Amino acid sequence: MSETNTGTPVVTFEGSPYRLHQPFPPAGDQPEAIRQLVEGLDDGLSFQTLLGVTGSGKTYTMANVIARTGRPALVLAPNKTLAAQLYSEFKEFFPENSVEYFVSYYDYYQPEAYVPSRDLFIEKDSSINDHIEQMRLSATKSLIERRDVVIVATVSCIYGIGDRDEYHNMILTMRVGDKLDQRAIVKRLTDMQYERNEMDFHRGTFRVRGDIIDIFPAEHAEHAIRISLFDDEVEGMQFFDPLTGHLLHKALRFTVFPASHYVTPRATVLRAVEAIKDELRERIDFFTRNNKLVEAQRIEQRTRFDLEMLDQIGFCKGIENYSRHFSGRKAGESPPTLIDYLPPDALMFIDESHVSIGQVGGMYKGDRSRKENLVDYGFRLPSALDNRPLQFNEFEAHMRQTIFVSATPADYEQQHAGQVVEQVARPTGLIDPEVIVRPASTQVDDLLAEIGKRIAVGERVLVTTLTKRMSEDLTDFLADNGIKVRYLHSDIDTVERVEIIRDLRLGEFDVLVGINLLREGLDIPEVSLVAILDADKEGFLRSERSLIQTIGRAARHIHGTAILYADTVTQSMQRAIAETGRRREKQIAFNLEHGITPRGVSKKIKDIIDGVYDAGSAQTELKAAQQRAAYDAMDEKAVAREIKRLEKSMMECAKNLEFEKAAAARDDLFRLRERVFGAAQHDLDGDGTK
């Protein structure tokens, strides 16, 4: 064991490339859970289940299992918010190893579709998040280059990406002293879908200046590489900052990875073009025989345009619809996915498996029904049906040794688990929330009173309702009563959702209202009360699993309480309350046995993914939170002095034309006045939100 500069112990294991930064040794049920899981893997168990309650340190247990086995790992999460949270935590545990993030790179995605009843064709439209695309490329690069890799992904990883072998064959490796013609390098870069751009040098581009070629690798976010040639020989290579041009350090060898997962060698493109032509002829014959002349003309026109593009530049819009021809697969064969990039001995962790497994099963059919219309009406060739996510049985066939992770395992995990490892006792000694049942007839007034108690002591509240309308009405009611409240709903995108959760932790507002978004894995230690309205309405949102998950959101606070508003106690409520009670008793017994006094969880408030979510705004929010704490500690005279200082600073900055500094001083002044006088001094969005 060694230590970092910050004093964090670093643990290594024999034969493992991982260096686990271990701020604290395993405690509670963790040591036994880690031992059993590693033993199960060594014994060759295909499936295991880690039944871990909220706040028991499941992620830390997973990190320990990965470090001890020394194998690459894929961690599946049910949504981007949870994936981002896991990525952030694994980065802290393995800062010296490769921790990667692989989620859908679409900020917006409108798939290609045809509505026969209205004769309406909807073109594919999408907006790609450049930074997430870079992280996806970095993930596949790491899997090819090294073994100490942890990939955190959503279930979008079961959608087809480029063939691993074709991708690997396109890699360009250069060493100092290699004989390489400048034109050959430029051609290889173009084949890898790098764009030559002398003016705007950004990720996935290159520029040529005499004997110097600058390449901005597609999988890098910050560094580019300069290749210096002399007489068709690589004379030197240096990393540099693409923004400032500052040279960083020399390199003796560098590997350029393709700018897209869908790159293919020229020979493969030509082979695919011939296969597409054959399929097109068959399809035209089919439509003609069935007297569908419009469809025959449509498929010919659309496909010939794509063929021309493929022949000339090796790429076309919607190239993924021809993926079967590029990979040489037969009709109906499973597409290549991220899982194919994993080595055979990799580990798979399926986090919140009771949700994730269901998602995997549901992906294929929705995709299939949309594409069948496109094929039937001549917008796409039948091979487009093979550009699809994995079917559930195919996913099962691709699964490596797998550990399901959930506080509420579903039927699939229970049927397939070789062993179930319980992790119920928390190292912090925190006890599961106290569950209180109160009548639904007075739920809103009672909730308002309970919220007031929590706000008075600086704690946060989550409220879950059954319908969108009720969430909106409740949010308006609470806001009218002076409560700082926000509403989390399905229309809010991933980035904004993460920011809302961060703002709740920072104290920008005190109450978060939602429907089905306040469940799995949301890590908010400041929340002391979870209120479940209409808890006696049986259904998906009020099932035993849903109730246990929602109650668990208050399990990270020392005063955690869950209030279920119901006029009758349903069977789901009974089972959820009984299971929570069982876990409370086990934790209390553990605390007594080991002399543990429960202590709250303290967790740094920070941006979840640097670069994906604006780090600048995160720093601003952190500074604001620190200022609020300082303002709270001031007496009246100190507050008056601080207000005068800020007013003077604001006026001086404005006089010197330093408008950004003046605006920052103005915002600090508004915050201080709001804190002291209890009223908002300005309204940025017109609705009281900032």
From Swiss-Prot:
Domain of life of the organism encoding this protein: Bacteria
An MF annotation (GO) of this entry: excinuclease ABC activity
Chain ranges of the Helicase ATP-binding domain: 39-422
Record-annotated Helicase C-terminal domain positions: 443-596
SUPFAM superfamilies for this protein: C-terminal UvrC-binding domain of UvrB (SSF46600), P-loop containing nucleoside triphosphate hydrolases (SSF52540)
One term under GO cellular component: cytoplasm
Subcellular location: Cytoplasm
Alphabetically ordered keywords of this record: ATP-binding, Cytoplasm, DNA damage, DNA excision, DNA repair, Excision nuclease, Nucleotide-binding, SOS response
GO biological process: nucleotide-excision repair; SOS response
Chief location bin: cytoplasm
UVR domain: residues covered: 640-675
Binding positions for ATP per the UniProt entry: 52-59
Record has ATP-binding as a keyword: yes
Short sequence motif named Beta-hairpin, residue ranges: 105-128
Pfam families linked to this entry: Helicase_C, ResIII, UVR, UvrB, UvrB_inter
Subunit composition and interactions: Forms a heterotetramer with UvrA during the search for lesions. Interacts with UvrC in an incision complex.
Functional note: The UvrABC repair system catalyzes the recognition and processing of DNA lesions. A damage recognition complex composed of 2 UvrA and 2 UvrB subunits scans DNA for abnormalities. Upon binding of the UvrA(2)B(2) complex to a putative damaged site, the DNA wraps around one UvrB monomer. DNA wrap is dependent on ATP binding by UvrB and probably causes local melting of the DNA helix, facilitating insertion of UvrB beta-hairpin between the DNA strands. Then UvrB probes one DNA strand for the presence of a lesion.
Domain remark text: The beta-hairpin motif is involved in DNA binding.
Family: Belongs to the UvrB family.
Protein name (record): UvrABC system protein B
Gene field: uvrB
